[in-house]
Amino acid sequence: MKKFRLFALSLFLPFAFAGCSDDENEKEYQVELDAVVKNVHTNLQTSLGTDVPSLSVYIVSPRGTYFSTAKGANGAAVTPYSYFRFASNTKNFTSTAILKMMQDGWLKLDDKITDNIPGTTVPYTPDVADWNFPHKNEITIRQILQHNAGIYDLTNDASQYNIGGETYADYMLTTNPDFQFSASDYVKLLKDHNLTYGTPNTVYHYSNTGYTILSEIIARVYSQKVNSNKTYGDFMYDKIVGPSSVKPLAITFPELASDKQLPSPYIKGFIKYDTHDEITDLKNASAHIGEGNGVGTMAMLSQYIRTLMKGENVLYASSAELMRTNKGPATTNGYGLGCSNFQGIGYGHNGATEGYLSLMAYDPASDVSVVVLLPFWDLRGNNLNKCIATLNSTAIEAKRTLGY
C-alpha cells in the first residue's frame, strides 16, 4: 500500500482579491471562473464516483487576481491562505537555493559532488564509506538538479529495492511513523545495495533521493560559509523565504520527524482506498527533506513562482532563465533545473504527497501565474491519474477563462 509516495506529476497531463476593480468585465471573469472550476470539480466527482473534498485555483494576471474554489459535500472551505503540504514543489525551492549559492560564488553547478566547497578543504558530500554510493565520483550538482545523475529513488521506486513490496520510505513510515530520516540514511542504502539507474547523463530518471542529497549539500555549504552548523531549513529560512529574504513568505520546510502539525488555518489531505478512507495532516515530513517537505499556501506559492520567474526574487533573471531551459542530455521532457515546462500553463513544478496534489506555474509570455490545489488522492484502480490530470486541466481552463 504505497500511500506515502511523493513524486512529480506527468508533464502531459465568488470574489476577486486585491488588484481587481469592480467593473463588469472583472465581475464576469469571476463568475465564469467559478463556473469553470465547479464544472471541472463536478466532472471529476462523476468520473471517480465519489465525493471530492475541494478543487481550488488562484490566478494572477494582467487582468487581475482571482481565486475560485468548489467544495464537495464533505469538504472543508479553502481560501488562498489555507496551509497545505506542497510536496515536490519543494524541488523548485531547492533548485532556487542551489542557484542562489551559485550566484554568490558559494558553489559551481558543474563541480563533482566529491569536490571541495570553493574556498575550503571540505567536500560537498561527506567523505566517508557510507556515502560511497554508485557513480558518486562522477556526479555533478547540475546533473542532480536535472534528474540526470542516475541516483536511485528510494521513496518512489520499489523495483530494485523494497521491503515486503514497499519502498524503503513507505515501509519505515508505516512501521515507525516517528522515524527520523536523513540523507545519510538514504545513501547508505544506495551503497549497501548498489542501487543506481546508470552513469550520469545516460538516463533521465526522477529521483527524490537525489534532491535529498542536494539538501545535504546546501546544509554543508551554508555551514562552511557562516562557520556554524546549519541545516537545509536554516538556509531556506535565512536566504529564500524568511524575514530577511527578498520576498518574505511564511513558508516552512519541516525537518524533524516530530514536527507534524501544520500551521493554522490548514486543509487536511484525504486518501480514498478500496476498503477505507484516511485523513492526512499530521505527517512526518523528514522522509522528504529538500524534495517534498514544504508547507505553505496558494497565495504564497503564487507570489514565489511569479517573482522568481520574473527575476524579482533571489535569482537574477538570467538564473531563472537557466532554471527553465537548462535540460540534461538524457532528458526527454521539459524538465530543467528543478523546473517543469507545462504546455499551455507555464514553468514551475507540481507535487503529490499523502492526500495532497498541487501545481504552481508562471507563463512569461502572458505574465500569468496559476496555482491549483486538490487535497485528494483516489487510489482505487487508475483513479489517481484522473486526479493528477485535473491539476493541468484546471490550470488551462482558468487561463482560458481570463483570455490567455
Residue map of PLM features:
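Bacterial Sec-dependent N-terminal signal peptides
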Residues: 1-29
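Residues that line or immediately flank small-molecule/substrate-binding pockets and catalytic motifs
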Residues: 8, 59, 120, 148, ...
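Catalytic loop of the DD-peptidase/beta-lactamase superfamily, centered on the K-T-G motif
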Residues: 20-76, 202, 221-224, 230, ...
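Short active-site loop at a secondary-structure junction
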Residues: 53, 75-143, 196-209, 289-292, ...
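Short, solvent-exposed turn/loop segments enriched in Gly/Ser/Thr/Pro and often Arg
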Residues: 59-61, 65, 113, 255-258
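Short, surface-exposed loop or secondary-structure junction motifs
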Residues: 126-346, 350-352
